[in-house]
């Protein structure tokens, strides 16, 4: 007997939560919503998502998760317009109609939706998947979403779209443009059906998960968007820290804590440019960062449940650096700041574990760079020095 691994969680705006044996039927139903979504005006969609952001901001609770308030900031009309202008050559009206290209009457362009965007959402921080879903809907692409095994939070977020309506858009109609399914990671047959029906494949997750998705057969013109295992870090110099030590520690503690470092732009290593042989400013910063980590965890973003495997990994790492450095940590496993004089970028542990390391000259980090680097946070006292430090 072969167990069904395809579960229809949400389609046609209705929560089903039942096993089914025909994934193609769900896909056909979703495609029927294409015309409605394509007909919506970008201004109306912007109004809707701005209102949704306000709704989420005012209703952040255990049903939606602690990180939602930061997602809501992304949904502000001002931010979404800025993001769209970057991608659409400055004219967001191109999503609705043909517009002149660079004020040239001889050439026009119209940004057409691709069709069905298929999202493989990672299980470690499922709220992050909302970013790609919102952007897909905003550009009028239907969303077929393979959720992780623990999908209740993500499902609650999608269903909450029904609670928001604006003058032109009823959230219930927008939810009809989304289908949620669960497929076992080893069910490559149904995974391939997803892939072959995708006009865009959007993959969230680690290297192994993303590689599996990319290996699936797809149509020739299907495009891939990868939210894979990127790495971010920060560089501060001692001159900058003279006046900004506490403020920098607070901001970095928040960056580390949001999404528990599973977001690509969360720092894992913080370099302090320092010529003091005693590294006093580096140690002082590590201590201040630990105070801020505790405050963020207690007052703003309480740590969510952590797997036993990750707890053991953190415990082992703390024991290692008790001998070769200095560890500032919570009494439990909520957060960990590791000071050491090791060279280079630390291997990421995630789960609010951040490394603070001295570096004699910030330009040295250039030798550690590769395509995996996503973001660099800078706290450099001099603008010219700042530009030089990041031009690797």
Regions inferred by a protein language model and the residue ranges of each:
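N-terminal Rossmann-like NAD(P)+-binding subdomain of aldehyde/semialdehyde dehydrogenases
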Residues: 1-114
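Conserved small-residue-rich beta-alpha loop and adjacent elements
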Residues: 96-165
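Donor nucleotide-activated moiety binding/catalytic core segment of transferases
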Residues: 102-121, 182-192, 334-350
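Short His-Asn-centered micro-motif
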Residues: 119-123, 146-148, 183-184, 203-206, ...
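Short, aromatic/basic amphipathic alpha-helical patches
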Residues: 157-163, 212-217, 284-289, 384-392
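Conserved NAD(P)+-binding/catalytic subdomain of aldehyde/semialdehyde dehydrogenases
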Residues: 170-276
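NAD(P)-dependent aldehyde/semialdehyde dehydrogenase
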Residues: 250, 258-377, 387-392
């Amino acid at each position: 007997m072969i167990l069904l691994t395809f579960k229809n969680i949400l389609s046609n705006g209705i929560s089903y939560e039942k096993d089914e044996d025909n994934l193609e039927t769900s896909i056909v139903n979703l495609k029927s919503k294409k015309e409605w979504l394509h007909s919506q005006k970008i201004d109306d969609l912007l109004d809707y998502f701005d209102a949704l952001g306000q709704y989420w901001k005012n209703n952040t609770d255990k049903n939606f998760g602690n990180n939602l308030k930061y997602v809501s900031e992304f949904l502000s009309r001002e931010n979404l317009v800025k993001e769209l202008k970057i991608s659409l050559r400055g004219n967001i009206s191109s999503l609705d109609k043909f517009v002149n290209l660079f004020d040239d009457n001889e050439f026009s362009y119209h940004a057409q939706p691709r069709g069905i965007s298929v999202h493989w959402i990672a299980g470690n921080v499922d709220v992050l998947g909302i970013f790609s879903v919102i952007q897909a809907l905003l550009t009028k692409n239907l969303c077929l979403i393979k959720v992780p095994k623990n999908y209740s939070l993500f499902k609650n977020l999608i269903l909450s779209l029904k609670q928001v309506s604006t003058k032109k858009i009823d959230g219930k109609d927008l939810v009809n443009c989304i289908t949620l399914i669960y497929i076992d990671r080893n069910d490559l047959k149904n995974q391939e059906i997803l892939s072959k029906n995708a006009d865009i494949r959007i993959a969230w997750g680690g290297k192994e998960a993303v590689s599996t998705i990319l290996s699936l057969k797809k149509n020739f013109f299907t495009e891939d968007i990868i939210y894979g295992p990127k790495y971010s870090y920060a560089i501060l110099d001692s001159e900058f820290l003279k006046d900004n030590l506490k403020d920098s520690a607070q901001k970095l503690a928040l960056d580390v804590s949001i999404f528990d470092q599973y977001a690509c732009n969360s720092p894992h290593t913080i370099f302090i440019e320092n010529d003091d042989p005693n590294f006093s400013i580096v140690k002082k910063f590590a201590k201040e960062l630990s105070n801020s980590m505790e405050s963020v965890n207690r007052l703003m973003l309480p740590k969510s449940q952590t797997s036993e495997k990750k707890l053991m990994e953190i415990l082992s790492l703390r024991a290692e650096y008790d001998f070769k450095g200095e560890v500032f940590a919570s009494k439990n496993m909520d957060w960990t700041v590791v000071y050491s004089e090791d060279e280079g970028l630390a291997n990421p542990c995630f789960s609010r574990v951040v490394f603070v390391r001295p570096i004699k000259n910030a330009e040295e980090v250039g030798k550690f760079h590769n395509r995996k680097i996503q973001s660099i946070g800078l706290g450099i006292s001099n603008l010219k020095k700042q530009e030089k430090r990041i031009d690797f």
